[in-house]
Amino acid sequence: MFYAHTSTHGPEPLEDHLRLTERLAIRYGETFQSAGLCALIARLHDLGKRTEKFQNVLAGKENHIDHAIVGAWYLNDEYFNCAKHYTDDVWIHALCCAAIRGHHSELCGRLISPSLDDLCLPDDDEYDIPLNSNGKRSALRDEAEYDEVAAYAQTQKLISQLSNEDYPTIDRTNPEARMLYARMAFSCLVDADYTATASFSSQKEPDAERVICPDEMLTKLHQYRNSIIRIVADSGKAELPINQLRNEVYRDASIRGNGPVGFYTMTAPTGTAKTLALMEFALQQAKRNHFDRIIVVLPYLSIISQNAEEYRKAFGADTVLEDDSNTEFPEEVKLYADRWDAPVIVTTSVKFFEALGGNMAVPLRKLHHLANACVVFDECQTLPHQLTTCTIKMLQALPEYFHTTVLFSTATLPVYAYRRTLEHFQPVEIIENVKGTYQKYDQLKDTTVIALDSPMTYESIWEKFIGVDQALIVFNTVNAALGMYHYIQDSLGSGSVFYLSSDLCSEHKQEIIRLVKRKLKNQEQCFLVSTQCIEAGVDLDFPSGAREYAPLSSVIQTAGRINRNGEHPGTFYVFGLGERNERRYPDITYQNESQVTEFLASEYGGLSLNDLSLMDAYYKRVYYGDREAGQDSLELQKACKYADVQAFSEQYHIIDDKNQIIVIVPYEQLSTEFDHLSAELQEQDYCISKAQMRSSKKIQVSRYASRKSMEFLRRHCHALFMRTSKYGERIPLNWMIADMDNIYNPQTGLQREESTDSFVF
C-alpha cells in the first residue's frame, strides 16, 4: 500500500487522495469549461508518491525529494510514445505538464513553442542526480521503478483522452489570455490538492463553496441604503443637489447591471457615492448571470477597511471577506481567505494582481474563484503604465473565456484606447449621460479651482489660507509634506495641524483620520498636510485645499475632498514648488504626467477638473507623447510574445519592492504590543516568525530606502532574520525593528535623516 499523507489518525491511501483531488478539481474547473482537463492533472499530480523514496519521506527517513516531477515525466513520456495522443494540442500538453510539475512551487515554462526537453526521462544512472530546477532528487529510484509507476497509472486509468469539450479554445494570438488560462487550471489543481489534504487532516468533508444569494443581498443593500437616506433626510440635507446626483448614479448602475457578461466602466465624479452604486451593479449582474461571488479591488491599503466595513454593515460580517496584508484571520477563517471563498471579497490591487499575473502556487490558489464572478475595480486609473496593456488584455479574457464581468470605476475617464496596443479597447459605459453628470456636478459643487503661478514656497502657499480655519494640502513627496507641516506648526502650534504619509503605521493613520473627522464635524480649526495616501476612499470634506501639480487623476482625487457635498463655496489651489525642492516626484513617469497637468493648466488658462475634454486631452498627451506610458516594458512584451509564465511573473509587479524595508515601530497607542514583540525577538536572537510578522502589521512602516537612509535605519534599528528551522542558520530579511523610541515621532511617524533621498509612492 502506498500513502499520500500521514496523520495522528493514520495514513491516507494514495488512491483516496487522488480521487478526492480529482473530484474537487472537476468542481472548480466546471466554472470555465475545464472539468476534463482539471480532472486529468489532478489524477496525475501526486503520481510520484507511489515510490519508495517518497514513502521514506513519510516515515521520516528521507527528505529533499521531488515527487511532483514524476507525474509530469510520465505524462510527457506517454504523449510522445503512444500511438494516440491524449490531446492534439501541444500547448495544452505543455500546460498540463507544467501544472503537475509545479503544484507545490510555481508554474513555469513557455506555452508558445514550448520546450519540453527537460521533461524527457533521465538515463537510468541519472535518476538520483539532483534536479536543476530545485536541487531536490526525483522520487524515482531508477527506470525499473518508473515502469512500476507507469503500470500503476495505466491500471488506474489516470490518463484519459481530452476532447474539445474538456477545455475552451483560447485564441492562439492572445498570449495574455493563454497564460491566464494556464494559471486558472493550475489554480484549480493547487486548491483541490490543498483542500483535499486539509480534509484528510481534519477528517471532515470539504465545505461547499460559499456563493452569493443575489436576491437576498439586494434586499439588504436596499434596506441599508434607505437607512442612510433617512439619516440624511433627518439632517435636512436630502434635497442637496449632490444627493440627487448620487441617486442618479445609483439608478444607472442598477439598470445597466441587468446586462450580459462583459467589460463595463462607470465614469462618475469623486463624491457621488460610488461604493454602494458599484455593489448595486455587481449584485444585479450576479442575479442576471448567476455569478458565484463579487470581488471588489481597491487601489490603496488605507481605504480597504473603510469600504469593507460599509459592506459588512449592509450584508453582515459572514458575507464579506476583507483580504489585505494587514488583516489577521482566525484559523477557522484563514482557509476562506487563502481561497477567496466568500460571497463578497474586498481586496487590494496588489493582492489581486499578485494572483492574476503571478506564478507561485500559494497566491494562485485563489485565482480560479475569479471565474463566474463580477470583479469591480474602484479607481482603475491607478494601474502602473508599464503594466497597463498586458493587465487589460488579461482582464479582457475574463468575460471572454471565464464568464466574468469586469467593471472599471473611475472619476477621470482614462482613455486606454490611446495606448498604441489598446486601440480597440472600448468598455461599455454604465452612466447614461457622463457629460451631463459632470456638468451637473461642476455646477452644484461650486468650487473655484485656481492654478497658481509657479514656483511657490511654503510661505506663499500658507498665505492663501490666511483667514481660513480648515484646509487640506497635498504634496507629491514626504520631504515636501514634512516641510509644509513644520511651517504651519511653527505658525499655529501642534494642536490644529496634522500630518499623513507612508511614514505612519496603519494604526497611526487611522487615528489621524479619526481626529481630523472629529475636528471637521465640530468646525474646529484643522489643517491636514498629506502625501497622496489621502487621495482615494478617505471620506473627508474640507472647505478649501491645495494640491501640488501631479497626474491629473491625483489632482482630481484631492479636489474630491474639497466641498464634497456642495454645501458652501469652496476653493482649491493647484501649485508647483520652487526648485529648491530637488526631488519633487516619486519617479519619472509620475514626473512626466505631472508636467502634462501643468502644461494643460497653462494651455487652458486653468484647470476645469470636471471638463471631460480636459481629461481626454490629458490622456491623449500622456499615451501619445510618452513612449514609456504608451506601452508595457520591453521585458513584459517579450514574456507575452512567448507566453512565458515565469518570465512574465518576474516582471509583473504592481509595487517595486526590491528596495523596500519593513520597520516595526513603537507607535505609542500600541506600545504594549511593541514592547512584548521586542522582548520576544531579543530572546529569539532577532529571528522573526511568520506569525510575528502577521501580528505586527498595525505597527509596520514600509520604506523605500536609499543608501543613506539605510545607514540611518541601521543605526537606530535591529536587523531581523528568519531561520530555516528551529536551530537552522539565520537568513537576512528586509525587516527591522526600531531600537529607540525617538525614531518614531508621535506626529510624523518614522523619522528620516536624509529626507531628500526618500519619497512616497
Predicted stretch roles:
Residues 412-466:
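Interdomain hinge/linker at the junction between the two RecA-like core domains of SF2 helicases
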Residues 260-282:
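Walker A/P-loop
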Residues 3-9, 301-302, 321-333, 476-479, ...:
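Conserved helicase motor
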Residues 350-353, 361-401:
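SF2 helicase catalytic motif II
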Residues 277, 282-284, 290-314, 415, ...:
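Conserved Walker A/P-loop ATP-binding site and its immediately adjacent core
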Residues 2-9, 14-223:
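Accessory nucleic-acid engagement/destabilization modules that flank
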Residues 316-357:
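Inter-Walker segment of RecA-like/P-loop motor cores
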Residues 399, 459-460, 466-468, 479, ...:
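C-terminal helicase lobe and adjacent C-terminal extensions/tails of nucleic-acid helicase motors
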